[in-house]
Amino acid sequence: MQFSISALVLGLAATVYALPPGAPSAGGAGSGNGVGNKGNTDVRFSVPDNMTVKQAQAKCGDQAQLSCCNKAVYAGDTTDINSGILGGTLSNLIGSGSGASGLGLFDQCSKLDLQIPVLIGIPIQDLINQKCKQNIACCQNSPSSANSDLIGLGLPCVALGSIL
């Protein structure tokens, strides 16, 4: 009985130690994305502050659509060191292991349109960072739909900040 209680306490202590650190306080150190300590912490490839929607759309080209994506998962977030002849074989088959989260997969994306102002004589510059605070990506124009897919991937996207 005494062994099981100490094993339980040790297990709980190991769980607490393994938890990721809590979120930093608002405005404190570490609350930004590492580029001037500003913005969303989930944005890996930031874009310049003075880039407009028109410039970003031109960078994407005519074969891709400028999009704002709420979620992005990048490969290389985890690293597993496997030893032995068949070390890691099962984990690689079931989809875990190094880079298991994908190769820059973007999810929950919405289209960013270039809005033409009503008054043509007044130049209005829509800054891309004002339109989208999440991941800005160039998504391939394709008629595919991922609504009822098993994998759920419809549009291959590339982070805009990675091609600048």
Swiss-Prot record:
Its main location: secreted. It is found in: Secreted; Secreted, Cell wall. Disulfide bonds join C60-C138, C68-C132, C69-C109, C139-C157. InterPro entries: Hydrophobin (IPR001338), Hydrophobin_CS (IPR019778). One of its GO terms (cellular component) is fungal-type cell wall. Glycans are attached at N50. Induction: Expression is repressed during growth in liquids, whereas several days of growth under aerial conditions of solid culture induces expression. Residues 1-18 form the signal peptide. Pfam families: Hydrophobin (PF01185). GO terms for molecular function: structural constituent of cell wall. Keywords: Cell wall, Disulfide bond, Glycoprotein, Secreted, Signal. Self-assembles to form functional amyloid fibrils called rodlets. Self-assembly into fibrillar rodlets occurs spontaneously at hydrophobic:hydrophilic interfaces and the rodlets further associate laterally to form amphipathic monolayers. Belongs to the fungal hydrophobin family. Aerial growth, conidiation, and dispersal of filamentous fungi in the environment rely upon a capability of their secreting small amphipathic proteins called hydrophobins (HPBs) with low sequence identity. Class I can self-assemble into an outermost layer of rodlet bundles on aerial cell surfaces, conferring cellular hydrophobicity that supports fungal growth, development and dispersal; whereas Class II form highly ordered films at water-air interfaces through intermolecular interactions but contribute nothing to the rodlet structure. This is Class I hydrophobin rodA. The lineage of its organism: Eukaryota, Fungi, Dikarya, Ascomycota, Pezizomycotina.
